[in-house]
Amino acid sequence: AKEKEVTFQ
């Protein structure tokens, strides 16, 4: 996810 500042754990 480099489009938004979202982090997936």
Curated annotation (Swiss-Prot):
Q: Which GO terms describe its cellular component?
A: extracellular region
Principal subcellular localisation of the protein: secreted
GO terms, molecular function: toxin activity
Q: Which UniProt keywords apply?
A: Neurotoxin, Secreted, Toxin
Q: Where in the cell is it found?
A: Secreted
Source domain of life is Eukaryota
Q: In which tissues is it expressed?
A: Expressed by the venom gland.
Q: Which organism is this protein's natural source?
A: Scolopendra angulata
Query: What is the protein's given name?
Result: Scolopendra 5887.74 Da toxin
The family assignment reads: Belongs to the scolopendra toxin 4 family.
Q: Which residues form the signal peptide?
A: none
